[in-house]
Curated annotation (Swiss-Prot):
The lineage of its organism: Bacteria, Pseudomonadati, Pseudomonadota, Gammaproteobacteria, Pseudomonadales. It comes from the Bacteria. Its EC number is 2.8.1.10. The keyword Cytoplasm applies. This is Thiazole synthase. The gene is thiG. The active site is at 106 (schiff-base intermediate with dxp). It comes from Stutzerimonas stutzeri (strain A1501) (Pseudomonas stutzeri).
Length: 264
């Protein structure tokens, strides 16, 4: 998106990005579709599930980094599939080893397989260890404003509350909690999980989120590459609308044209 005079840059760990759309790499039919969708999205940050995707830990198997180059994209390793703080910390350390000292990670510690809700207790434990270990932690969490505040205060560089359950496409289920998190935010707030279509992404940005991370909404679309492009423009439209400031809602009608000087 071209720079807007009254906008502030989207910055993570000291690096500024033009795109406010972050995308995942799972659930595509093959690596070529993955590559094409990510390119169409315009995203600069690509998140990778270290426990599910080969980024060098399995020599001889197809390597995602052969099609998603770390020279072009910021690779964001994530801890999807981890259900304890210990597993999440171990996974982040593996990613750092595989990516030559890479410090930026997305922490997620899940509570159970059915809901994939974040386990906030284990998340807090893992975040504390990772921050002390020198990682730049972006953290997937619930939409509880108190937990979001605690994660920011302990040193997470971005807080990523869910908009809906992972992979459901339900959209922004609780915009009111998100608004409270955004009002109190001292670090970037990104919606993570729940987005189903372009309008959901736009709503998240209109609320004031710095960015949106998504995977299923693109990968599960009938045409993932086309949906990726739609999301690119949805994010831009939402950001512009947020900066422009929407008109206030009113109970009664208000004519667009003044009544003075009517032809009679």
């Amino acid at each position: 998106m071209p720079p807007v005079p009254n906008d502030k840059p989207f910055t993570l760990a000291g690096r500024t990005y033009q795109s406010r759309l972050l995308v995942g790499t799972g659930k595509y039919k093959d690596l070529e579709e993955t590559r094409a969708a990510i390119e169409a999205s315009g995203a600069e940050i690509v998140t990778v599930a270290v426990r599910r995707t080969n980024i060098g830990q399995n020599p001889g198997e197809p390597n995602l980094l052969d099609v998603i180059s770390p020279e072009r994209y910021t690779i964001l390793p994530n801890t999807a599939g981890c259900f304890t703080a210990e597993d999440a910390v171990r996974t982040c350390r593996l990613a750092r080893e595989l990516l030559d000292g890479h410090k930026l990670v997305k922490l997620e510690v899940l509570a159970d397989q059915k809901t994939l809700f974040p386990n906030v207790i284990e998340t807090l434990k893992a975040a504390e260890v990772l921050i002390k270990d020198g990682f730049d932690v972006m953290v997937y969490t619930s939409d509880d404003p108190i937990i979001a505040r605690q994660l920011a205060e302990m040193g997470c560089i971005a807080v990523m509350p869910l908009a809906g359950l992972i992979g459901t496409g339900l959209g922004i289920c609780n915009p009111y909690n998100l608004r409270i998190i955004l009002e109190e935010a001292t670090v970037p707030v990104l919606v993570d999980a729940g987005v189903g279509t372009a309008s959901d992404a736009t709503i998240a940005m209109e609320l004031g989120c710095e960015a949106v991370l998504m995977n299923s909404a693109i990968a599960h679309a009938q045409n993932p590459v086309l949906m990726a492009e739609a999301m690119k423009y949805a994010i831009e439209a939402g950001r512009l609308a947020y900066l422009a400031g929407r008109m206030p809602k009113k109970l009664y009608a208000s004519a667009s044209s003044p009544l003075d000087g009517l032809i009679r």
